[in-house]
Amino acid sequence: TGGPGVGKTTIVRAIVALMSAKMRRVALAAPTGRAAKRLGESTGAVAMTLHRLLEFQPRTQSFARGAHDPLPADAVVVDEMSMVDTELFRALVAAMPVSAQLVLVGDVDQLPSVGPGAVLSDVIASGCATVVELTEIFRQAAASKIVVSAHRINRGELPDLDSAPGGDSDFYFISRE
């Protein structure tokens, strides 16, 4: 987990490269089409929505993949995990092969799921999984006042409000009179 610009995508790219080098099958998924597309573009691998990965059947409102027919993967990486609700996560866990690894990637301070539950936060709080929290801002994100301000706010600090509209900054404070 970690905020914007801390290297979550870089870590996922490295996981995919390492697993591929070991001839292991990696499935990449995200809760939305847009997030899946970004995940695929950033890793150079095929990524899909969780519903597509689990082979959602609209007629029966169920998934074809489950304990009876697990996913053909040695590892499953789910990005934007904060948007996954409990029902979808339950279906994913049920479809995991016994020996497969599950990697959950997301920012607990980002968009919550529309459906019930705060799965990523709950998994982290449970202590049942190994958690890596990335905190250092890298590359172009370090120059973005939006990213820096978001991190400051998450730490309970005030952002730098000195930027004037029309300047070189990407973050402005507009005073209301």
Please tell me what each predicted stretch does:
Residues G5:
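Walker A (P-loop) phosphate-binding loop of P-loop NTPases
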Residues A17-A27:
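Post-Walker A helix-loop "phosphate-sensing" segment adjacent to the P-loop in P-loop NTPases
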Residues R25-A30, R34-A95, E136-I137, I146-V147, ...:
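Conserved P-loop NTPase motor core of helicases/translocases
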Residues K8:
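Conserved lysine of the Walker
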Residues T1-G2, A30, E80, G106:
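The Walker A (P-loop) glycine that initiates the GxxxxGKT/S ATP-binding motif of P-loop NTPases
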Residues I11, I15:
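Hydrophobic positions on the alpha1 helix immediately C-terminal to the Walker A/P-loop
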